[in-house]
Amino acid sequence: MWIPSKLTRPGRLHNAIVRPRVLDLLQHATCYKLVLFRSPAGYGKTTMAAQWLADKPNLGWYSIDDSDNDPFRFMNYLLQAINKATHNACPNAQKLAEKRQFSSLHSLFSEVFAEMADYHGECYVVLDDYHLIHDETIHEAMRFFLKHMPDNLTLVVTSRSTPPLGTANLRVRDLMIEIGNELLAFDTEETTRFFNQRVSDGIDALTANHLRDYVEGWPSAMQLIALQAQHQHRTLAQTIESVSHFNHAHLWDYLVEEVFDLLDDETRYFLMQCSVLDHFDDALVSSLTGRDDALAMIESLNRFGLFISPLEGETNWYRFHNLFAEFLAHQRQARIPQQEQDLQRAAAKAWLEAAAPHQALRHAHLAQDTELLASILSQYGWKMFNQGELEVLEAAINQLSPPQLYREPKLCMLQAWLAQSQHRYNDVGALLAKAAKEMKALNVELSTKEQGEFNALRAQVAINQNEPEKALELAELALSQLDHTTYRSRIVATSVVGEVNHVLGHLSRALSMMQQTEKLARQYQVYHQALWALLQQSEILLAQGYVQAAYEVQDNAFKLIEEQQLHQVPLHEFLLRIRAQILWCWNRLDEAEQAAYKGLSVLENHSQSKHLHCYSMLARIAIGRGELDKAGRFIEQIQHLLKQSTYHVDWTANASLSLLLYWQVKENSTEIRQWLQSSTRPDKACNHFSQLQWRNIARAQIQLGELSEARHTLDFIQEQAQEYQLVTDTNRNLIVEALLAITEGDDLQACHKLKQALRLTNQTGMIGNFLIDGSKIGHLLEKLVHKGELGDLERHRAHLLLKEISTTQRSRSIHFDEEFVEKLVNHPNIPELVRTSPLTQREWQVLGLIYSGFSNEQIAHELDVAGTTIKTHIRNLYQKLNIANRKEAVQTAEQLLQLMGY
């Protein structure tokens, strides 16, 4: 439950004096990124900000308390404030935050900025009491927010200390207005107006100056002095004498003597009871105190001026002034310490009645009542889990004693799921093992249903640890133990059964189970699991050779992401990755590249280790285009990641394919040999990733001349592919078999394998796999076409392949990489002008791209540099080669290519 009062600015400012000297400094605040009100407690930061912004229509206010250090909670309140300031300009970002469907705070802010691009009104967002935030993740996110937020937004922060928001940098760049305690402190003129407004006898200049100097302009102290004068019917001069020894350290004593002791016992007790609550309405107070007249009491205190502020726009919601709240807490602990635990328990129960278990947990913790904590977690834990309150839940569970945790299987399960949902896969198994041991020691007997829930999660752990047989056994056992009401565990167990069958090569059963998983997940609105099931279905269909069907399932997955705002979850990258793989196979390289880059964007703030798949695809695309310089940079990234982390064979096999293709083009046999010697060799090849790994091994063996070993490898994987009906891998294997036959000098066998591959390609649409070795198989494709040995569809496909091979070869010559340029400049017939005015490597690349028909903008994008830089390169190469225009540049490039035999 979100507390509405946290999103409302303070009301009732009619007693505050107008402060033109401060307001004048804020006249041009819209020209600054940040307005910071920074001072110790009691200097009127919030009041000053509220007064300044009172007539600003586009305003969002967020009152922070110490429970807001949870990034999920903080972001939800902040986005609600932003939407209030911008008239709901960021609805999608709000939905992402509420559903916790963002990969990082940066990516969520990026969505905010994208949505705010269409909002042009001047607006303000206030973060009140930011000093209560100590979470570094939030600080870092807010620094990013300040750096990139739109110019029409001004952030206003009130804080007792300097917030770690990069204020030094903002100050140097003149992008911040800072209102410190020296400005917030009253001067003599303001002190005079302040007391004249509150004290019937007024104040003379000498007394005002004396008062101002004594309390150093501290508004709260002045308020206390005015209260003393009012209640004791003293003049201000007499009041000054009574507080001659007043200072910050003695504030509590002063408040006791001059304010608190003036109240009747009933009011004092009521205030101490209410002070347990940070925010409250009459219903909460009534539940806490048992009083039926709670609202009347609160309104009476408000009229009396006892630091209770009604919250603007919310009926009967209040909060104490921070300073007074601290004082009341001090009094409560000094005067009624024996009631502290009971009050905190009562506050917890009051918040539960208000459907706010998050607040209830905090008070149960303050009550040191772990039994109450356990009860709240047992009753509300899964609901909070589904709402994304993961950190709050984990902190509460960690406060429980072992008996409290392990006597309740539901809490053990919740603890393990918290680790699983936060991708701490290595912790989950340990937590489950410890839970089993502790429950046995406590003689806790699990019901059949509870056993099923534990086994479902154990099955997920087993599949994460690449133990498919164990995972299948546990998942099937779980399904036999679970009833239909435990939908989450049934969905997980069903998914694991499908995933295991996929890994073991039982594709038809795997597909059926994943379709069932999707249906259940959609029915119970577990959309992450539905998305996972769709991704698995796509991979299964692809393995079965139904590539178009796999593509269409991916379309459904993209639709689900749109509908449920799942754009920033890591599974979105998985979808983009497998979409890129299909597009690469169809030789739609531009689209594949876009998908891979978008995948990197989704994972922007995740561990770099997760980027391996995308870099593997980008390297493969660059190699296919002949952009070996670019490919080399991706290869370096891949090699770095492989050294830093341990990966599943699915990841390493894809990365290895890119490495081998790069080394093959670079004729680097040393690297290929080293890879082959250390390569993983799966026991079976019953799924797409073990097939790919063995196919990589065969490719390396062919490249190194180990042809008999390659034959043995290919025989093995083809036998496995046919046994498990891996149609797409059969298609790919045939192409490598043709490559082996060519290397052995057996063109007849190579043609036979190519014909089979072309026939299967009618179903799969595979083109990219042929183009990998286009230079070696091209002449045989021509022979097959000319001999008339192909059917109409196969012949059409062969013509397309020959055209693409020709284009690819041309592309590789057009992209002037280092190797090509070195051969060119050393050619005996190179024009003297080229020899005497050598181009830089980048200028050669630009010339090649001009020849390819790229515009300046496209060249800049291709080389990842600014457009102005490209113009400089073009000007330089024109001067060096005595070229007048683009047409002459194309002619010059063509002449050089012809010189090299292209």
Swiss-Prot record:
A GO molecular-function annotation: DNA binding
Domain of life: Bacteria
Pfam families per UniProt: GerE, TPR_MalT
Keyword line: Activator, ATP-binding, Carbohydrate metabolism, DNA-binding, Nucleotide-binding, Transcription, Transcription regulation
GO BP annotations, alphabetical order: positive regulation of carbohydrate metabolic process; positive regulation of DNA-templated transcription
DNA-binding region of this protein: 856-875
Functional description taken from the UniProt entry: Positively regulates the transcription of the maltose regulon whose gene products are responsible for uptake and catabolism of malto-oligosaccharides. Specifically binds to the promoter region of its target genes, recognizing a short DNA motif called the MalT box.
Residues binding ATP: S39, P40, A41, G42, Y43, G44, K45, T46
The keyword Hydrolase is assigned to this record: no
Family, similarity comment: Belongs to the MalT family.
Residue ranges of domain HTH luxR-type in the record: 832-897
Name recorded for this polypeptide: HTH-type transcriptional regulator MalT
